[in-house]
Amino acid sequence: MSELTLGQAAKLAEEYAARGLAKELASLRAAWDDEVEAAARHADYRVRSQAYRALAQFRYRQKLELLRRGLDDESPGVRGSALIALEALSRDHPGDVNKFRSLLHEMAARDANVAVRRLAIVCLKNGTPLPDTIRLLEGIAGNDEDDAEVRRTARSVATLLVKRSRAK
């Protein structure tokens, strides 16, 4: 697999997943496991960002603890990539969001980077529609001092979660 870069291998993994080639995806995943781990710990934030994006492309659901490192990273770009990966991995697995709910709440409410805040809010849509999450999002949506896009995203996700909670 050394003839491929991590980005190319991740793109190939995404293609395998889209085509339902589970055996090929598993083989590629096994071959790139160590490289993804090493990239997630790299000194360069761009390499770390690529590693966290690759977690979703490779469908590495067993690497949620590694994903936590990305959510706690000093770089907003890395945190954003980790959030994008979490959103993708949690679409069919709300438990993934639930594992990180308190951290996502903190990021949605207080992260210094507006894009990271919005991505954290978007991740919350895939979780269980709990009242504390809905209250947090409604509070963000109603805060005129917050960024307009953050408020709009929070309002949209809160509305979706309320609908889902009533459908149960």
Question: PLM features: residue spans?
Answer:
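Structural detector for internal amphipathic alpha-helices that build alpha-solenoid repeat scaffolds
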Residues: E3-L28, R46-Y60, R69, G80-P94, ...
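Amphipathic alpha-helical scaffolding segments comprising HEAT/armadillo-like alpha-solenoid repeats
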Residues: L25-A39, Y60-D72, D92-A108, L130-G142, ...
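Generic amphipathic, hydrophobic interface segment in small proteins and small subunits
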Residues: E37-S49
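Short inter-helical turns and helix N-cap capping residues of alpha-solenoid HEAT/ARM repeat scaffolds
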Residues: A43-D44, E74-S75, A112-N113, E145-D147
